[in-house]
UniProtKB/Swiss-Prot annotation:
Keywords: Cytoplasm, Nucleus, Proteasome. The proteasome is a multicatalytic proteinase complex which is characterized by its ability to cleave peptides with Arg, Phe, Tyr, Leu, and Glu adjacent to the leaving group at neutral or slightly basic pH. The proteasome has an ATP-dependent proteolytic activity. Its main location: cytoplasm. This is Proteasome subunit alpha type-5. The 26S proteasome consists of a 20S proteasome core and two 19S regulatory subunits. The 20S proteasome core is composed of 28 subunits that are arranged in four stacked rings, resulting in a barrel-shaped structure. The two end rings are each formed by seven alpha subunits, and the two central rings are each formed by seven beta subunits. The catalytic chamber with the active sites is on the inside of the barrel. GO terms for cellular component: cytosol; nucleus; proteasome core complex, alpha-subunit complex. It is found in: Cytoplasm; Nucleus. GO terms for biological process: proteasome-mediated ubiquitin-dependent protein catabolic process; ubiquitin-dependent protein catabolic process. Belongs to the peptidase T1A family. InterPro entries: Ntn_hydrolases_N (IPR029055), Proteasome_alpha (IPR050115), Proteasome_alpha-type (IPR023332), Proteasome_alpha_type_5 (IPR033812), Proteasome_asu_N (IPR000426), Proteasome_sua/b (IPR001353). PROSITE patterns: PROTEASOME_ALPHA_1, PROTEASOME_ALPHA_2.
């Protein structure tokens, strides 16, 4: 039996007497140390965006990516440990392709979130067999896409929970971003309004100046049903438009 909180800290498969698994709680706290990412669902599209932190001038910015494609119609943006995210995203990609091959149809956005969370809970050791990870995944994903049910935005977290949102933010600036969402977001937003709100929030929560190279933005429109990651010129136009709006 564990006799102290410190010993419960080390156990990833054991609840404390208060009903808590501390390692999962610590993984959720680790996400708050990551850069801010957010997503907005509108009737015509779902938009995801992220703060892009380049740790050094010697780093090639093109190698730092927070928005990733899972399938043609699904993209994700992350906050937390990038290496952990890569494992989850690679798993989601394989599941999406297996679904397409087996059923001759694209995977639903919710099923993609579920597949990701199925892997999220495969940590620790049990029955003498080592799991994929010895600890919880220290990353949260916002999974955005369009399927037969329209545009959708889902969040996953280290506990294996997945939840659908109209608008959501994760990472260091999540609390401030969610305050703005509660004041400015409405379900009938146009794509242009959602883009402007995205830039406005990132401008407020980022420590560095917001530029076309310091953020990433992507969209999955209902009209095409395909993920489109904006280039720097498109991002600059949104930044300029939002500045004029203010």
């Amino acid at each position: 039996m564990f006799s102290s909180k410190t010993e419960y800290d080390r156990g990833v498969n054991t609840f404390s007497p208060e009903g808590r698994i501390f390692q999962i709680e610590y993984a959720i706290e680790a996400i708050k140390l990551g850069s801010t990412s957010l997503g907005i669902q509108t009737p015509d599209a779902v938009i995801i965006a992220a703060e892009k932190r380049v740790p050094s001038t010697l780093v090639d910015p093109s190698s730092v990516n927070k928005i990733l494609e899972i399938d043609h119609h699904i993209g994700t943006v992350l906050s937390g440990m990038v290496a952990d995210a890569r494992i989850l995203v690679d798993h989601a990609r394989v599941e999406a392709q297996n679904h397409r091959f087996t059923y001759d149809e694209p995977m639903s956005v919710e099923s993609c979130a579920l597949a990701t969370c199925d892997l999220s809970v495969q940590f620790g050791e049990s029955g003498g067999r080592k799991k994929l990870m010895s600890r919880p995944f220290g990353v949260s994903l916002l999974i955005a896409g369009v399927d037969e049910n329209g545009p959708q935005l889902w969040q996953t977290d280290p506990s294996g929970t997945y939840t659908r949102y109209d608008a959501q933010a994760i990472g260091g600036g999540a609390e401030a971003a969610q305050t703005v969402f509660s004041e400015r977001y409405h379900r009938n937003m146009t794509v242009e309004e959602a883009e402007n709100l995205t830039v406005q929030i990132l401008r407020q929560v980022m420590e560095e100046k917001l530029t076309k190279t310091s953020v990433e933005i992507a969209i999955v429109p209902v009209s095409t049903g395909r993920l489109q990651i904006y280039d720097q010129e498109q991002i600059q136009r949104i930044i300029d438009r939002q500045a004029e709006e203010n």
